């Protein structure tokens, strides 16, 4: 929804803007599909041929994938690797001065940067592999982060 709002604002500002929303990443949402409500918590739609974004952490790759529409999995895929440790534990363990970090984050609230440190998340690679092997997705592109914006 936010990406679409940004796209609309750009279209209003720039006469020659031809951008269009390519990938949206709802991951805690209820959507009506085929007459029923599908609740996805930590998952995102992966309908056959539909693009999805599976984000890694600030220190790990993210992936653009194409859904395979597996009905047994409610035409869904995982939204990411998941947290390895709770936010309060990361705040306790991470150096407050950012020493030794090889990632970049722009944020309004410093505690959010620390809470989202790469070590707080599980690696995304095995998640992508498992979903590919299960026939839920096919990889399209691997994206390496260079900076992250965190509200």
PLM ranges: what are they?
Residues 1-151:
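Domain-length cofactor-binding catalytic modules of enzymes
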């Amino acid at each position: 929804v936010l990406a679409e709002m940004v796209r609309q604002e750009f279209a209003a500002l720039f006469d020659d803007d031809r951008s269009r929303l390519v990938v949206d990443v709802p991951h805690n949402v209820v959507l009506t599909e085929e007459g029923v409500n599908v609740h996805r918590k930590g998952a995102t739609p992966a309908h056959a041929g539909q693009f999805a974004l599976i984000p890694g952490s600030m220190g790990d790759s993210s992936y653009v994938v194409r859904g395979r529409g597996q009905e047994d999995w409610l035409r869904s895929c995982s939204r990411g690797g998941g947290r390895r440790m709770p936010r309060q534990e990361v705040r306790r363990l991470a150096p407050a001065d950012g020493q030794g970090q090889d990632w970049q984050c722009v944020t309004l609230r410093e505690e959010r940067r620390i809470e989202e440190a790469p070590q707080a998340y599980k690696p995304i690679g095995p998640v992508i592999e498992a979903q590919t092997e299960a026939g839920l997705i096919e990889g399209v592109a691997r994206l390496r982060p260079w900076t992250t914006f965190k509200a």
